[in-house]
């Protein structure tokens, strides 16, 4: 079978364009914000429910599209999203509503994970010319500093009640990983070194300190309130949307990507070796040698505990493979980059309507025709393409 040139600027830009066309302009709700639930054919199947993660990720998508194409409609869509984020998601307490339905707030819990994407959205808003977003970044950072930052551990706690009075005992690496990503973006937008310094601290404390608590020196997902590994959290719910049990190969490779992105901004001699280690081990343990693709999760003993194939795992991994190839010139990573794309091209990408299927089973079959429920937006796939594009010469 012949494939496109997956490592070419022309291909990556065309793929982003087709993915954007799946969502835009259908996703624009003239009443405010974005529709967030799409069937395989692009039709909206829930016009009312809005999730903070989708509301912010769409802003990223449109801002990045504008920055790379200079198409004004994309900037207008990003601004449309910012207005909804500030008018509807932002609460009087200073936090952001996690889930809402029209005029009803369904879940007002304050999540660090959600606030990470608020910072990412504001950073992108600043990059497309909304100068007031620099203050919004600062205010959100200060909010996190006041309520979420645990100086003793050098990490962010995970969730707090809407009135800021009840702190969940759960601690997780996922929110800290996305805070690292968001703070790098904040640094890029503002050039304020405190954001990069914090991103570097998060990377060190998760990828070195917390990873050292696991026997394999990989990043476990779940922790107790004193940041000790909780091996049993969601053990009976391995498919939990945001907190699945097991090592997440997609998060090992996503950290590999982030470490290499940090290395570009402020080099440290441990970034590349750790990125290689996390990526190599995850790829070895999670790659389906019979049917292709990376599985979703594996147990501490290395056996696969969730054989499904998720879109974002393949996308984050091809970005990491490419950055590793660029950093090491090792052809193994180039081949893995192509292999991940070939699997995705054959099974995960909808060549009829555009965008990626969210999830496949271990036999590479779809579970349903809900391509893009809340939280997806193809932020991972397009974001991965943009990271590769940044390294390609014009």
From Swiss-Prot:
Active site: 251 (proton donor/acceptor), 380 (proton donor/acceptor)
Pfam families per the UniProt record, alphabetical: GlcNAc_2-epim
pH dependence: Optimum pH is 7.3 with D-mannose as substrate.
Superkingdom of the organism of origin: Bacteria
Keywords recorded for this protein, A-Z: Isomerase
Reactions it catalyzes: D-mannose = D-fructose; D-lyxose = D-xylulose
Activity under varying temperature: Optimum temperature is 30 degrees Celsius with D-mannose as substrate.
GO biological process: carbohydrate metabolic process
Coiled-coil ranges (or none): none
Record family assignment: Belongs to the N-acylglucosamine 2-epimerase family.
Domain free text: The alpha7-alpha8 and alpha11-alpha12 loops of the catalytic domain may participate in the formation of an open substrate-binding site to provide sufficient space to bind 4-OH D-mannose derivatives.
Function per UniProt: Catalyzes the reversible isomerization of D-mannose to D-fructose. Can also isomerize D-lyxose, with lower efficiency. In longer reaction with a higher concentration of enzyme, it can isomerize 4-OH D-mannose derivatives (D-talose and 4-O-monosaccharyl-D-mannose). Cannot use D-glucose.
Assembly and interaction partners: Monomer.
Protein name (Swiss-Prot/TrEMBL): D-mannose isomerase
């Amino acid at each position: 079978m012949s494939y496109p040139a997956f490592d070419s600027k022309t291909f990556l830009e065309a793929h982003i364009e087709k993915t954007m066309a799946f969502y835009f302009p259908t996703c624009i709700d003239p009443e405010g914000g974005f529709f967030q639930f799409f069937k395989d054919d692009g039709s909206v199947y829930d016009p009312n429910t809005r999730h903070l993660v989708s509301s912010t990720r769409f802003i990223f998508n449109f801002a990045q599209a504008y920055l790379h194409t200079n198409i004004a409609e994309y900037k207008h869509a990003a601004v449309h999203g910012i207005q909804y984020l500030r008018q509807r998601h932002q609460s009087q307490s200073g936090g952001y509503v996690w889930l809402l339905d029209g005029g009803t707030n369904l879940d007002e819990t304050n999540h660090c994970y959600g606030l990470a994407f608020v910072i990412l959205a504001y950073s992108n808003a600043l990059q497309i010319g909304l100068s007031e977003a620099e203050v919004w970044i600062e205010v959100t950072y200060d909010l996190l500093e006041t309520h979420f930052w645990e100086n003793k551990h050098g990490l962010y706690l995970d969730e707090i009640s809407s009135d800021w009075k009840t702190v969940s005992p759960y601690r997780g690496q996922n929110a800290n990983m996305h805070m690292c990503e968001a703070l790098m973006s904040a640094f890029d937008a503002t050039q304020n070194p405190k954001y990069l310094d914090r991103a570097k601290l998060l990377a060190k404390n998760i990828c070195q300190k917390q990873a050292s608590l696991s026997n394999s020196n990989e990043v476990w997902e779940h922790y107790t309130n004193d940041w000790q590994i909780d091996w049993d959290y969601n053990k009976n719910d391995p498919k939990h949307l945001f907190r699945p049990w097991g090592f997440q190969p997609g998060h090992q490779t996503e950290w590999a990507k982030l470490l290499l992105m940090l290395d570009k901004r402020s080099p440290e001699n441990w970034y590349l070796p750790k990125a290689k280690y996390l990526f190599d081990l995850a790829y070895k343990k999670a790659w389906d040698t019979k049917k292709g693709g990376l599985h979703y999760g594996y147990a501490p003993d290395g056996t696969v505990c969730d054989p499904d194939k998720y879109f974002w795992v393949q996308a984050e991994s091809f970005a990491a493979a490419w950055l590793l190839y660029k950093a090491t010139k090792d052809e193994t990573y180039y081949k893995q980059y192509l292999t991940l794309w070939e699997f995705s091209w054959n099974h995960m990408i909808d060549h009829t309507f555009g965008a990626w299927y969210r999830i496949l089973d271990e036999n590479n079959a779809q579970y349903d025709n809900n391509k893009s429920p809340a939280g997806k937006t193809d932020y991972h796939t397009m974001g991965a393409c943009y990271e590769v594009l940044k390294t390609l010469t014009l």
